[in-house]
Amino acid sequence: MSQLQESAVLSLAKDLISRPSVTPLDEGCQSLMAERLSQAGFEIESMVFDDTTNMWARRGTQSPVFCFAGHTDVVPVGDLNRWHTPPFEPVVIDDYLHGRGAADMKGSLAAMLVATERFVNKHPDHQGSIAFLITSDEEGPFINGTTRVIDTLEARNEKITWSLVGEPSSTHKLGDIVKNGRRGSLTGNLTVKGIQGHVAYPHLADNPIHKAAPALDELARMKWDNGNEFFPPTSFQIANINGGTGASNVIPGALEVMFNFRYSTEVTAEILIERVLNILDAHGLDYDISWVYNGLPFLTGEGPLLEATKAAIKKVTGTDTDPQTSGGTSDGRFIAPTGAQVIEVGPVNATIHKVNECVKVSDLELLTDCYEAILENLLCK
């Protein structure tokens, strides 16, 4: 066996991947991590909310608090016949570790833990505290996961100073991109009311599709803002639309539309809601609408966490990383509102949520070194 195949981070990543922890299952991943963190001097606190398993682990009692955040749950594997290897039987092929969760994000979890073990061994009297916030409900409804842990910490005034989320942020090579912010996400569920009837007698019915179409067109064409130097302009997308009985001779009685905003810091959810309602009202629609607040936008500007991350990636990989705010949401959106600086640093995201998910073994080694260097930059001054 090669040295890479025998490494601590690869061994742990394999152990984690072998556990089929599809949301909201944890399948013992956190217990495995907790055992090793306990040996490194961490106090372990399990927080179980309904069907979700969470772990808060902390070493030290002083500020500042550096927190690794991540999730043990993975998305479903999909069609097993399309996998080259069984998704929960991790295997290395040509320097790539294959398995569900390899990139998102059990590889990152392994790198976090091994980096922390090494750091604590070298610097047992480090400044501040190190913490882990791990959940089994990131890929799912995100109701009983990180948000509940944060509520618990806030209730007892336990604050995180810096948080590194291990989401796969890299695009082409490890460290080329980190996420120092994310757009907000707001979902609208709209029902436009009409009167069902026969298509041959439209004067006896009221077609909600015809009524809604101009309003939806205006919403789709609207320029919501211009973005700024950190965020692209706010985007509006219709995700689902449903109306009709399936018959060609029936005018539907209602039209259901689900749409989503990914919005910048130039607007708020309240502003977007007000503008949507004004457009719907201007078109004279009879409607019901409900809203789902998926997360606020956040941004970590220049400061200790971003500087430490840039320096670590440059030292380990030679790459000048590019901080970006593009992409979907992450659990960082629940941590940032507490006042913490938040950044996402992880492996290449080319295969996440796909069949044959994989990550370069050599990247896991580099990621471990990056995480350890970030700890040193922040807690060894």
From Swiss-Prot:
The cofactor binding remark recorded in the entry reads:
Binds 2 Zn(2+) or Co(2+) ions per subunit.
Gene3D superfamilies linked: Zn peptidases
Q: Which reaction does it catalyse?
A: N-succinyl-(2S,6S)-2,6-diaminopimelate + H2O = (2S,6S)-2,6-diaminopimelate + succinate
Q: Which BP terms from GO are recorded? A: diaminopimelate biosynthetic process; L-arginine biosynthetic process; lysine biosynthetic process via diaminopimelate
Pfam families xrefs: M20_dimer, Peptidase_M20
Key word Metal-binding present: yes
Function of this protein? Catalyzes the hydrolysis of N-succinyl-L,L-diaminopimelic acid (SDAP), forming succinate and LL-2,6-diaminopimelate (DAP), an intermediate involved in the bacterial biosynthesis of lysine and meso-diaminopimelic acid, an essential component of bacterial cell walls.
Protein name, UniProt field: Succinyl-diaminopimelate desuccinylase
Native source species: Shewanella pealeana (strain ATCC 700345 / ANG-SQ1)
Q: Which gene encodes it?
A: dapE
